[in-house]
Amino acid sequence: RFWILISQVAMMLALLPLIFIEVKSVNLTLIALLTLHNTFVAISDISIDALAADSLKEDQLANANGFMWGSKTLGRGTGMALATFVFYGYGVNEAFFLLILLMSFIFLFPLFSKELSYKAGFQSESYKNRLTLKELIAGVSQSLFNMSALAAMTFMIFSNIGYGIFDVIYNEFYIEVLGWSGEEIGYLRPIGMWLGGLLGLSAGVLAFYFGKRFLLLFFITCQAFIFLAVSSFTADTPDSLSTIAIIGVDAVDAGWSVLIFSILMALCTTNTSATNFGIFMGFGNISMLIGNNIAPLVLGSGDYGFAFIVAALSLIPCLLTGYYLTRS
């Protein structure tokens, strides 16, 4: 909870200068402020998920994580739609001002929340508010140095590489190659996020009927096929296919994210569960960073089609480790 509050304040302070700075192009000031903001976004995300890992019992994880991730994805879609409207209707400074207002409202939730002094379901066990370095290392080692945890870390380190590549180049690809406008993309992409949010909210029910393994592998395979399909798109590609791709990539990404996070939470059962889950999430953030940074290199080594093929191939380790993690 402490790190959630600190991160939320830092995120708002990092964006505050952008209300007054005229932004006409990318510059060092903009890069520095957004990098600082995104750093605390990552810390906040890890802290929120770690708090959930501590606050929920194992049999609650799938449904609760579905609600968490589904709500987050719905929020991202709504935010993108609202940002597109404000940006094109009023300007970038007004968009940042509105963002800070919304963040100030959201800040009230962690401010008035409470944190358990124990891992949910393990009230009878002794837990300390602060651990020595030796105790921390012992607790982390107990949970992370086993085959399931190693498979989970492998999954997470590859999980967002493809999405990270896509996120960097899709906008330019849709504008330069497919002939779309930035405004069209901005109004369309939230639909995929909203669909992903609905998938997240219903993940617990879907997993009950279809099985967690089938759904996880199905969503990952769908995302890989979308990347492969986009690699073949040209200026003559029907808008309907381009629309399905840009909507589908966010929808299926949210679907498998909900499932894998519930699996990761179930692996965190020691008194360092929050730290352990934070490590898993850290690997996921590193994966996105890898994808974002190699995207220009991959694009420079070939073309857009080659970059999307690399994005698809990066999901193969996730299929293998996902199969292992969902064994009975």
Where are these regions (language model features)?
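C-terminal transmembrane helical hairpin of 12-TM major facilitator-type secondary transporters
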Residues: R213-I263
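Short amphipathic helix-loop junctions that connect adjacent transmembrane helices
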Residues: V168-I185
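C-terminal ends and interior cores of transmembrane alpha-helices
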Residues: L5-K24, T221-T237
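A late C-terminal transmembrane helix in Major Facilitator Superfamily
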Residues: N271-G300
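Juxtamembrane intracellular "pre-TM" segments in multi-pass secondary transporters
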Residues: S117-A151
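Intracellular juxtamembrane helix-capping segments at the cytosolic ends
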Residues: I43-L56, A254-T269
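Loop-to-transmembrane helix entry/capping segments in MFS-fold secondary transporters
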Residues: E58-F67, G182-E183, C268-F280
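Helix-to-loop junctions at the C-terminal end of transmembrane segments
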Residues: F87, L199-K212, L299-G300
